[in-house]
């Protein structure tokens, strides 16, 4: 059981763990609880009615949040020739092929997302043991294995996030910063929620979205009503 600091415990007293709020109320609460000296990240956790041990219930993908996450992301691109030039022009932070593979094998990992063109995936495969555990391996399901490198880079820089259900059936994702206004956070939240609803596996039975919890980096979680997935953005 992790130990929490005095400030967290004081904040926890303000949150009724049995109370389930509408999304706007929950977002207001999270913003009030985000009192750290840095701009805390607002995160959401969806507990889904899936069993990720079965391949047909694994949920993984990516979505561009309309207002981004508030965090700048460094992009490394594995590509050759014209595609390498295209990546550089699009604002990639590192571009290469064999040379980039060697650099990473040497311990360099100063990037947040990796993109690769399909023709160099044989090379990138050598980095599986290094990049895989860190969630940095390019993957067609998240749009990071593509010949359209310019678009991939632009989407990532604009606020594209990847999501993946963990072994307990939960998806954790950042949806912005505490400094964002509530409406922007809600629109990011709604975009991700709509994406997950569309991604519901046919094999998933029973209630799909079992619970939703919002929190900031340092705050306790605030529960959101999972039975009202739409009409969440109406101004109060």
UniProtKB/Swiss-Prot annotation:
GO terms for molecular function: rRNA binding; structural constituent of ribosome; tRNA binding. It holds the Pfam family Ribosomal_L1. Part of the 50S ribosomal subunit. PROSITE patterns: RIBOSOMAL_L1. Gene3D superfamilies: 3.30.190.20, 3.40.50.790. SUPFAM superfamilies: Ribosomal protein L1. Belongs to the universal ribosomal protein uL1 family. One of its GO terms (biological process) is regulation of translation. GO terms for cellular component: large ribosomal subunit. This is Large ribosomal subunit protein uL1. Binds directly to 23S rRNA. The L1 stalk is quite mobile in the ribosome, and is involved in E site tRNA release. It comes from Heliobacterium modesticaldum (strain ATCC 51547 / Ice1). Keywords: Repressor, Ribonucleoprotein, Ribosomal protein, RNA-binding, rRNA-binding, Translation regulation, tRNA-binding. It comes from the Bacteria. The keyword rRNA-binding applies. Coiled coil: none annotated.
